[in-house]
Amino acid sequence: MKRLPKIISHINSSVDGRLVADRWTLPFNGKDIEDVLSVYTEIKDGYSADAWILGRNSVQKHFFSETFDNGTFTSATTFQTYIGHRDSKRSLVIFDSKGLIRYTDDKVYGDNIIAVLGENVSEEYLEFLRQTGISYLFAGADGYDYEKALHILYDEFAMRLVLLDGGGMLNGLFLKKQFIDELSLVIYSGIDALSGISSIYEYKGKDCEYPAYGQSLELMDMKQCRDGVIWLKYKIHKKDNNHE
């Protein structure tokens, strides 16, 4: 069995399970919403994790909006892990299977970036990452061999505790693969209420699939934080997922 880091799904949601914070109702006490949302970050920092994980959509929405065009370049032929700048205590692992993010920095919030790619990227994109100082590794041909990626993070980057920050689709894929060991759910006292908005876990599958099957939640702790924020901690018990 491959050695993998412990994965804690650390999520900030409204009471109706939505993830888009700029759609939530405002705090009851008149406080600035960003101040209330900082409870989530304070809890995150308290974990002292080796890394946190985001998917490409979240990264391009919040940090690096430009896209790299791999289509006009030469396909990569070697797929070895590259170690770039490693001077931060914590890293940000970004799952970007097609190598689409055009980075303008090697860090987010002071955390070194590690890109998880598929083997369909261009040689020019890999050179771009190296020039920027960004580490990268490969998660199989299509970039979706998450077990391989997590093993590399454990074995080559010495990561033992990693926080999965989302978004909803990446959370859903990790849940389906039973990679999540704990759920840390920070609930903001607000509502979105619109159907179709990204929620905590979103697995894009068929009606006959049960992505959470074989997994049970045990409440480990709950805490009322400031400004009405609730923090719930669950252990996820797993069995073989054979209910496809």
Q: Model regions: which residues?
A:
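Enzymes that bind and transform nitrogen-containing heteroaromatic metabolites
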Residues: 1-244
